[in-house]
Amino acid sequence: MPQGFQVTGRVEPETHRIIFSIRGQIDSRVLIDRFIEIYAGIDAPWTYDRVFDYRRSDGLVEHVDVDRIAAWWAGHIPADAPRSKVAVIVNNPLDLVRARSVNDQFPKDDRQTFLSLDDALSWLDEGHK
């Protein structure tokens, strides 16, 4: 992994969420490799709501790598998998718009993009209380 670039993923069993934290200058290929590695270590990851926190990162995910994770995800989730919620947290209004451009590649996800963790968590909690 490039120096200063870090991708972590943790499962929160009490909320049934996977929380991804991305820090540093994004290396698109490495980022997607790490997502796949984390997902592969979780039983039925498609049953979890997910948070992707990009607030402490810089750079863009290349389209070829978005295509790669979308294809990997589609190939690993069952056809009858329920929809899950995905909150993407970014650090500026431009990325807010950019992040939404990939929503159609993940048809089983109810995806929303946010500028704050609090707003993302409030949205994830809706309907789960």
Located regions from the model:
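Amphipathic, Lys/Arg-enriched alpha-helical "gate/interface" segment within cytosolic domains
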Residues: 1-129
